[in-house]
């Protein structure tokens, strides 16, 4: 017996109307439990400095006459 003949022996019934599947509630977009802070270094990184600090610039000494004063 073919599949169609077996089906015809049963009384014809309209197929049950399947409701469209829905979420029980509208699904919220996924979020972090808390607002995520921007990633940071574990320690705050100090600004990079020269390994040796330059000594403070001293003003050039005032000009002196090259010749020492003549002593008699």
UniProtKB/Swiss-Prot annotation:
Entry GO CC: cornified envelope; cytosol
Conditions for induction: During squamous differentiation of epidermal keratinocytes.
Location of the protein in the cell: Cytoplasm
Disulfide bridge partners, by residue number: none
Annotated segments matching region 3 X 9 AA tandem repeats of [PS]-K-C-P-[EQ]-[PS]-C-P-P: 21-47
Annotated organism of origin: Homo sapiens
Superkingdom assignment: Eukaryota
Function as written in the Swiss-Prot or TrEMBL entry: Cross-linked envelope protein of keratinocytes. It is a keratinocyte protein that first appears in the cell cytosol, but ultimately becomes cross-linked to membrane proteins by transglutaminase. All that results in the formation of an insoluble envelope beneath the plasma membrane.
Protein name per its UniProtKB record: Small proline-rich protein 2F
Sequence repeat spans: 21-29, 30-38, 39-47
Pro residues bias: start-end ranges: 56-72
Single Gene Ontology BP annotation: epidermis development
Membership in a protein family: Belongs to the cornifin (SPRR) family.
Region entry Disordered, spans: 53-72
């Amino acid at each position: 017996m073919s599949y169609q003949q077996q089906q015809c022996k049963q009384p014809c019934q309209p197929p049950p109307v399947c409701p469209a599947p829905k979420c029980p509630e509208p699904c919220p977009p996924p979020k972090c439990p808390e607002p995520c802070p921007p990633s940071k270094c574990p320690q705050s990184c100090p600004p990079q400095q020269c390994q040796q600090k330059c000594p403070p610039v001293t003003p050039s000494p005032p000009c002196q006459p090259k010749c020492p004063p003549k002593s008699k």
